[in-house]
Amino acid sequence: MLYMAIMIPAIITVLMDNRQPAKTMAWILVLAFMPFVGIIFYIFFGQNTRKERLISDRSMDQLTKRSMLEFAEQENLHIPANNKPLMNLFTNQNWAFPFKDNQVDIFTDGYEFIFSLLYNIGKAKHHVHLDTYIFEDDALGYLVADALIDKAEQGVEVRLIYDDVGCWKVKDSFFERMREAGIDVHSFMPVRFPAFTSKVNYRNHRKICVIDGRVGFIGGMNIAKRYVKGTGKQKWRDTHLRMEGGGVYALQRAFLIDWYFVDRTLVSNRKYYPPVDSKIRNNCLVQVVTSSPIAPWPDIMQGYVRILLQAQKYVYMETPYFLPTEPVLFAMRTAALAGVDIRLLMPRHSDARMVEWASRSYLMEAIEAGVKVYLYTGGFNHSKLLVSDDNLCTVGSTNVDFRSFENNFEANAFFYDEEMAQRIKRIYLKDESSSILVDDVAYFVRRPFLKRLFESIVRLHSPLL
């Protein structure tokens, strides 16, 4: 009786989510064959949060239309016709408005990024807004923390959001020291018993910094020593951007929405959206697109699918982890079969063994359709970028995996500009020159049967990795 009392409501809950039939059946089977363990798994990893409204439409309206758009001056936008549907997709669903007049620096190693971040924090006059997944209490973390504390003691507004799970191993005293110095610090969706439920699976993976509303950072680098020094014998390769211009408005909005999420304070004022420097005048268009498990649609994933299916010549992608959702893998295979040059570059060895094992069966499917897979041998490549047809590119925090597309809070900058696309393309090709091409499925098939069987079993857990 106890079994039935638990199972029937659980199965009804799964059915009422109205997901894809395959996913619904998978969860029903888990609940049926592992009743008690299955329920725990479902609570942690299976709940559908897209129906939750953790931020009201009214608050979103105030944080967007009545703040950013009120101060943003956008005239004579020259929108490329071939990318207009993609831009409309992001604008209609995500309120990710395009901004022109952007100046961008690209960092491909941690030294450059941290130096620039510290330099710009040091120049801050009004505010520093930092949103990061990992903020470790190592030597580098203390360096950044000290810079933030110095600014707070000078009277500069400093707001910090760190992810509670990403910083699980960091001592509370590290952040308390910043609070005592006057920094407004919040952990994102803290995981505490008895609230230890699905929150553990939905994390803020964004890496955003905005300084005085004039300078912004976005990309794949967290605040930790390994992003500079590497791990063990492996060098660390990553991509991060520094932006000035109209796109900083969008980065500011992304941060302030997260701030409302953690602090329930609507921050909206002209001083957070200062006029763009008159020296920056170009048609480098950018949309800062965010995605989250509470949004109605998986916006960044839809953007990747759209790019893959609209490409005429090529799509080059870099990701540290490859556990693609069905729509993304299908789009990659479809584009490759249509003759588009689809290339995927990822590390030869991952920093997460389970992810590496699970990814191999997906790589086999991609290669069978003609996708060129490159395994990076110059260290651990943590970069998340995409470039297509010499006119479109994106850099951000999003991996090509279930977790980024479905579960995490992510942020990417999408650029519609030939010069920017060429710069990202050159970075990709340089990484490709330090990689080995795997264009034959036999590379994976030659491995022992039991090893391939194990990898296929691990693949079943891809949404959880």
Model-derived segments and spans:
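A short glycine-/small-residue-rich loop at the edge of a beta-strand within enzyme catalytic domains
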Residues: 295, 299, 319, 323, ...
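A beta-strand-loop signature enriched in Asp, Gly, Thr, and Trp
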Residues: 338, 343-388
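N-terminal localization/anchoring segments of enzymes in phospholipid and broader phosphate metabolism
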Residues: 1-302, 306, 310, 350, ...
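Helical hairpin unit composed of two closely spaced alpha helices linked by a short loop
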Residues: 311-312, 321-343, 347-348, 352
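Histidine/acidic-residue-rich catalytic or RNA/ligand-binding cores of hydrolases
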Residues: 326-329, 356-358, 388, 406
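Short, solvent-exposed amphipathic alpha-helical segments in soluble enzyme
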Residues: 331-335, 361, 430
